[in-house]
């Protein structure tokens, strides 16, 4: 969405409107009122940005009970205690290094699915929304993958930069930006480590956010 840029809320009222709409749609489907919830942040964001994200959710009528960073949330679903969780999101690449069940390092850089869309917009000479449709069109996946490969290579380089000096063997990819078939092979080539990508990686972090609240 355009209301968030590089993991930071840039359109406060627009973000509230989107969350409120999603809340209403979910309440209608479930037949219940949603009053409490959990939220997540990109790793390493400033405290001011954390407050902004919480304020958006609470302004939409949801009392935030817990905030967790996105890669850590994903680790709850993956059930891992050691390794690197890489969350390839819409605006950022988030990294969490776990050792003996504890997060020992987190980092985040502004490269994600949005940057893939911008590459496609320039390549096809279309606007952002049309490029987004092209990116998610399964019929064009092979063609699109060729063009967004440099973005994935940059993401892999970001991970390599941050995990240098840490003894890790396993890297777990989650997030919508790694949904492309063979995206994990780019990371294997760059990192030379064991790369794992779960089924439907786009849903791993959201489920992890819910599980984070259950750990209290």
Could you say what each language-model-derived stretch is?
Residues 93-97:
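Short beta-strand scaffold segments in enzyme catalytic cores
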Residues 1-88, 102-216:
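Nucleotide/phosphate-binding catalytic cleft detector across ATP-hydrolyzing
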């Amino acid at each position: 969405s355009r209301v968030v840029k590089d993991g930071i809320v840039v359109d406060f009222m627009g973000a509230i409107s989107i969350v409120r709409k999603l809340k209403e749609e979910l309440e209608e489907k479930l037949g219940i009122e949603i009053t409490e919830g959990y939220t997540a942040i990109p790793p390493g964001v400033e405290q001011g940005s954390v407050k902004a994200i919480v304020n958006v959710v609470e302004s939409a009528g949801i009392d935030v009970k817990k905030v967790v960073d996105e890669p850590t949330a994903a680790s709850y679903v993956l059930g891992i205690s050691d390794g690197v969780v890489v969350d390839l999101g819409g605006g950022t690449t988030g990294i969490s290094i776990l050792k003996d069940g504890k997060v020992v390092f987190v980092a985040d850089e502004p490269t994600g699915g949005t940057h893939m869309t911008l590459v496609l917009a320039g390549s096809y000479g279309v606007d952002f929304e049309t490029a987004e449709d092209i990116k998610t069109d399964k019929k064009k996946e092979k063609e699109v993958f060729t063009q967004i490969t440099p973005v994935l290579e940059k993401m892999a380089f970001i991970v390599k930069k941050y995990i240098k000096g840490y003894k890790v063997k396993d890297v777990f990819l989650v997030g919508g930006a790694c949904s492309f078939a063979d995206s994990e092979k780019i990371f294997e080539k760059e990192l030379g480590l064991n790369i794992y990508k779960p089924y439907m990686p786009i849903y791993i972090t959201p489920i992890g956010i819910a599980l984070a609240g259950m750990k209290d």
